[in-house]
């Protein structure tokens, strides 16, 4: 069976609130770490979220 192209990743908030999003990315085309600006409801602001592994 072939290895799937997309993998699940965890986007951790850089505001150190412990909030995270779970999303997918294509591991073959996006080899670098993903950094997105998304909404963190704990601090009620848009902050950067950096990619981390799902445990």
Swiss-Prot record:
It holds the Pfam family Ribosomal_L33. GO terms for molecular function: structural constituent of ribosome. Keywords: Ribonucleoprotein, Ribosomal protein. One of its GO terms (biological process) is translation. GO terms for cellular component: cytosolic large ribosomal subunit. InterPro entries: Ribosomal_bL33 (IPR001705), Ribosomal_bL33_CS (IPR018264), Ribosomal_bL33_sf (IPR038584), Ribosomal_zn-bd (IPR011332). Coiled coil: none annotated. HAMAP family: Ribosomal_bL33. Belongs to the bacterial ribosomal protein bL33 family. This is Large ribosomal subunit protein bL33. It comes from Phenylobacterium zucineum (strain HLK1).
